[in-house]
Amino acid sequence: MRLAPLYRNALLLTGLLLSGIAAVQAADWPRQITDSRGTHTLESQPQRIVSTSVTLTGSLLAIDAPVIASGATTPNNRVADDQGFLRQWSKVAKERKLQRLYIGEPSAEAVAAQMPDLILISATGGDSALALYDQLSTIAPTLIINYDDKSWQSLLTQLGEITGHEKQAAERIAQFDKQLAAAKEQIKLPPQPVTAIVYTAAAHSANLWTPESAQGQMLEQLGFTLAKLPAGLNASQSQGKRHDIIQLGGENLAAGLNGESLFLFAGDQKDADAIYANPLLAHLPAVQNKQVYALGTETFRLDYYSAMQVLDRLKALF
């Protein structure tokens, strides 16, 4: 019987602690978030986030944000699973029962059906639903996120601030930084400078990652030097004005692949073999010296999951 008062006191203390935590969390809201359309007020911490961008979704999952549904890309291709979700976080998406909104073409009706309290749109890229902004913003607070001009760590930090998951974002970045430091000690750099691309063999074209891209920034963090494009190279752009890629095709393809080593993001050995087999690229130093390296099909978009896989791949290669 003497335990009863102690038990009651323990319950009271636990209740006070929990209410204190809730009070602290509530004190963090509302929040003012600014994007290209102005300043938005989030009255409370989001509980039902819809990501119209498959690129953003991986970072939301990495910080344990309550993302309930996501846009998807073409299923069962080299970068996506049977749902059209990116392979590097496919398992996590299944565990958390992430719903697929649509494949490719955005749908405001599909978004509305999820009853979100926050909608995220990418500013550029093939997964951007920017054209539907006016419709989506009537459903729930809608934020436009640029991922093409920043590292995946900066994106993770930004999403942490938007969702109230700053702590989780900082923890993920710290975990990566620890592995990055270890990798830098281990890796022996191949011939420099390097060119980083996504190569499409069937179209004889490539998207080249710029120094502003998450991929380019990660390579520079590891000590790699990115090759500079030849002056006057006429490269094309699509999917809006983008900072992260330069599209190379035709006569510009060989001119743009001027690094001493080539890194193939979103590619495997078959893609490396296709470059070696392309007679128009046979004169490139990286091809002649067998310095073409595939970094894995899970690396099309960089987030916490794929960045860790890139580290593992580079350690295995070098």
Curated annotation (Swiss-Prot):
It comes from the Bacteria. Keywords: Ion transport, Iron, Iron transport, Periplasm, Signal, Transport. GO terms for biological process: DNA damage response; ferric-enterobactin import into cell; iron import into cell. Pfam families: Peripla_BP_2. Residues 1-26 form the signal peptide. Part of the ABC transporter complex FepBDGC involved in ferric enterobactin uptake. Binds ferric enterobactin. Can also bind ferric enantioenterobactin, the left-handed stereoisomer of the natural E.coli siderophore, and the apo-siderophore, enterobactin, but does not bind ferric agrobactin. It is found in: Periplasm. Residues 48-318 form the Fe/B12 periplasmic-binding domain. Its main location: periplasm. One of its GO terms (cellular component) is ATP-binding cassette (ABC) transporter complex, substrate-binding subunit-containing. Induction: Expression is regulated by iron, via the regulatory protein Fur. Induced by hydroxyurea. InterPro entries: ABC_transptr_periplasmic_BD (IPR002491), Bact_iron-sidero_bind (IPR051313). The complex is composed of two ATP-binding proteins (FepC), two transmembrane proteins (FepD and FepG) and a solute-binding protein (FepB). This is Ferric enterobactin-binding periplasmic protein FepB. Belongs to the bacterial solute-binding protein 8 family.
